[in-house]
Amino acid sequence: MAPDVSPALRAVAQGAAAAGALAAGAALGVFAARSIFRGVTRSASPDVSAVVRGTQRTVLAGDGVLLHVEIDESDVPLTVVFVHGYALTLETFRYQRAAMQGKARLVFFDQRSHGQSGQGEFDSHHIDQLGHDLGLVIDAVAPHGPLVLVGHSMGGMSIMALADQRPDLIARRVFGIALLSTSAGGIHGLHHALPLGLSRAFDVLAPPIAAALAKRKDLVERSRWQDTDLGLLLIRLYSFGSTGTEEGSRFVASMVSSTPVEAIAEFLPALQAHDKRESLGNLEGVDLLVMVGDKDRLTPPDRSVDIVERIPGAEFILVPDSGHMLPIEKHDLVTQALLALLDRARRAAMEHAAGGVA
């Protein structure tokens, strides 16, 4: 018999889902965040005035969903594709975008049902579909030349799905991969993230609760939190491992609040079911960077260690006093590590070309 989610739904509607925000972006907390920060606008996001918007493109996915893509051109013969996470947008990488413009050709896109991309159907909200979408974006806007792939959270899972589906592409063209705050084996067992040992119940109840909330979107959207300071605290708890800044918290909240309720609900089971550990071998031979915050509650460090142990030679950076939103919370460190990866990838691609390998 399926769990009776009615009491839980009522509790969420009354605001009890605030505790779920401690689960680092899992559905219940994201719903709470959406209610708290519905009034937050883009104007509250960090000021990165150096960012110059490049060419905007639309890529048609196999099922007709339109994927929003932005390209910052460069004469450097290397393309870097950035893939954002769950309930976020391509703006996740705005600091890296500002620092890396001109150093490579940069490609950013909103995953389906996120940001400015089109809404997918229920049965398309899974990690394998995101891998197919990523492959189509590469085929459409970067069909030739060496690549570096950068994925944060669910974006890292998308890269793993692509490697599972198209190992030939990885072997031929990808010279660097950065997996930031991600997991090769789902997001189960957040016992340390939820108080009072509630994570087991969360694992069982969250998907049906999320589905019920999606059906009652009007109920969720009407929810309001009057205490904005409390809302900011919750976002800090799930996003940042350090004190963080109110500006950064509002920026994360603005991305969360822009994500459709249906997408938040329907992607959660996919995050829990995700398991690409057996196909990580397809990344061998690629310069791999793995980074995670030591206080990441959604994809804790042991998930990154699991990836590194399966890929000989992978670089592992454990970032102290950091949570799940590394590209924002510790943007300088992330940018520095990515620039070093780009330099290595560029040299490797040049050596590859000089060797006459197709």
List each language-model region with its residue ranges.
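N-terminal cap/lid segment of alpha/beta-hydrolase-fold proteins
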Residues: 45-67, 71
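Flexible "cap/lid" loop of the alpha/beta hydrolase fold
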Residues: 164, 168-219
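Catalytic active-site module of serine/aspartate enzymes centered on a nucleophile-bearing elbow/loop
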Residues: 312-358
